[in-house]
Every structure is written in C-alpha cells, then in structure tokens.
Regions:
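FIC/Doc superfamily catalytic core
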Residues: 1-326
Length: 326
C-alpha cells in the first residue's frame, strides 16, 4: 500500500461516526488526566507505577498471575531482581519482569511531562526488536524458547500454528502455550497462533513493512494508528511469540508520541486483562477484514484506552497519597 493510500484509508476510518466520537471522548479524558494535581511534580513516579501495573496486567493476558506488590519488591532487589536479563526459572515471573523492563524502557523514550527533554527514540525496526528482546529474553535464558526467535522477525517460510485466539498469550494453556512460545516437538517449530490466516513469504514481508509504515507515517489519526498497529501485530504475528505483548507496548508508545496520552501514566493493558473475551472477540472481528469488523476493533481499542486513563488517574492519586503499595 502506498503512503497516500495508507493515509486515505486511515482518514476514512477516522471520519466514521463511531470512531470520531470515540476519538473525541479519548481526547477529553486525556485532558482531564493531564491536569491531575499529582502529575505536576510526581509524574516520574506515576509513570514508574504505571509501568508496574501495565506489566502485571500484561502478564495476566499472557497467562501469568503476579501481584503488583510482589513485582515492586522484585524491582527493589535491583539487578538480581527484575532489572537484569536473567531468568528466575519461573515463566510467570520471567513474563512479568520482561514486560516491566520493556515498559520502563518506553518511559525512557517519553518526553518530560514538565520540561523540554525529548529523548531520541530508535528507528521503528530497532525499537520493535529491542522491546521484543526485553519481553522474550528471560524466557530464552530460562531455556523455554530458542534464542534465535528473540528480537528477530520470524523467517518468511515459517508457518504459524493456527491456534484459536482466546485473548491469552505465550504462557496461556500449559503445553499448548509453550509450543506457541517457539518450542519444538518432533523436530518441527511450533510457533504462536492467533486470529486470521497464517502468512508467509512475500505476503508476510509486505504486512510487516505495512506495520512499520503505520508507525512511521506522519499525521495519521492517533486512535486509528494505535488500533491498527495493535491489531496488525495480533493478526500478522511477525515474531515467533509475544506479538500481542509487543502490540500492546506499541500502543503505549504511540499514545504518548502522538499526544493521545502525553502523560504516559495510562494502563491500557488493564482492560484486555480484565475482559479477555471482549479482547478476543474484537481481534477476531478485525481479522474478518470487513469494515464493520475493523470499526468494532477500533471502538474496542478506544474503550481500552479510556479504561487505561481511568487507571492512570487512580494511580496518580495513589502516588500523591503515598498509597501505591497498599
């Protein structure tokens, strides 16, 4: 798809009545969040707390149940806790700490909320690879997956197992999930499945290029961009595993970069973790490739972002009151 065609398609989606209304509601909620009293001086702490809560929510989507307080204690333990590229030998902990590391990295790329510092963000392909290494690296160190699938888009000839998508991820469902995490059985690669048809060859390469173009093309409608990038990560599945996790990380990154949530304190993973059935249903709707399905997905993404902003407002008040660890 040419750049002009991509822009035209995104603008057409943004003009759809339901999408336009959802976008307006998001900007109103974002403005309210931006002027939270706590964010005047303690926005750094709020962003850090959002990273903890996002990691916990994201881990739950991946089938790993970890408490926020337990993760905070791991982080406080320093390099031997959540901060190093090591394995705890517990896949649930490795998933949670990997997600926290990736979210913390994203915070480092965010502009100051008060001030003029604007860190340099890596090129999109490098950013995606780095975030994927953060998430999947501990699983490779622990021997659960091959290091060859970490940080690298899958080879075009690799076909994905067309497993049903139920909103879960790389740790969901025991053996089936470990197979989905890139393990081998009888010498054959068993990789992550998801909604939509399996892709390979030139089609896979073109769709990955389209994801990068969606991220890089300037002046696209923010809600439409965020929603499409997330959905394409779920349906194209350019990596062997953790595509959903990477998609949700990109949601946070793009929401801040494009001004949808300049605070960086939203927890947009929360909604998908609490209502996984709706997440799966919306992803399947998008994979249908119908206009109604795509719009339904964008509306779901808007709902997730709105709930994430509500969570951001709550955690900002908790940071101000000093009650985040209760």
């Amino acid at each position: 798809m040419s750049t002009n065609a991509l822009i035209d398609a995104c603008l057409a989606l943004a003009r759809e009545e339901r999408v336009a209304a959802a976008s307006e509601a998001l900007y109103e909620a974002s403005a309210q969040l931006r002027w939270q009293e706590a964010l005047r001086k303690r926005w750094r702490e709020a962003r850090a707390e959002a990273s903890v809560r996002a990691a916990v929510s994201g881990a739950a989507i991946e089938g790993a149940v970890v408490s926020a307080q337990a993760l905070r204690e791991q982080i406080a333990a320093g390099p031997k806790g959540a901060g190093a590229h090591t394995s705890s030998k517990d896949p649930a902990w490795d998933a949670a700490t990997g997600l926290w590391r990736a979210h913390s990295r994203l915070v480092g790329y965010m502009p100051d909320l008060v001030g003029r510092t604007r860190p340099v963000v890596p090129a999109t392909a490098q950013l995606m690879a780095t975030l994927h290494r953060d998430v999947a690296g501990p699983l490779a160190v622990g021997g659960l997956i091959s290091e060859a699938v970490v940080g690298c888009p899958r080879e075009s000839e690799q076909a994905l197992e067309n497993q049903s998508f139920e909103g879960g991820g790389m740790l969901e469902g025991g053996k089936a999930a470990l197979e989905g995490a890139g393990l081998r059985e009888n010498g054959n690669p068993l990789l992550e499945g998801g909604p939509g048809p399996n892709l390979g060859g030139q089609e896979l390469r073109e769709r990955l290029e389209q994801i990068v173009a969606l991220i890089d093309t300037p002046n696209l409608p923010a809600l439409v961009r965020v929603a499409l990038v997330h959905a394409e990560m779920l349906t194209v599945r350019p990596f062997a595993l953790a595509n959903g996790a990477l998609g949700r990380l990109l949601v946070r990154h793009l929401s801040v970069r494009d001004g949808l949530d300049p605070t960086g304190v939203s927890v947009s993973d929360y909604y998908a973790g609490r209502v996984p059935g709706a997440y799966a249903e919306a992803a399947q709707a998008y994979a249908s490739a119908s206009l109604e399905g795509v719009v339904a997905w964008i509306i779901w993404q808007a709902e997730a972002l709105l709930e994430g902003m509500r969570q951001g407002s709550e955690l900002s008040r908790a940071v101000q009151a000093g009650t985040t660890q209760r």
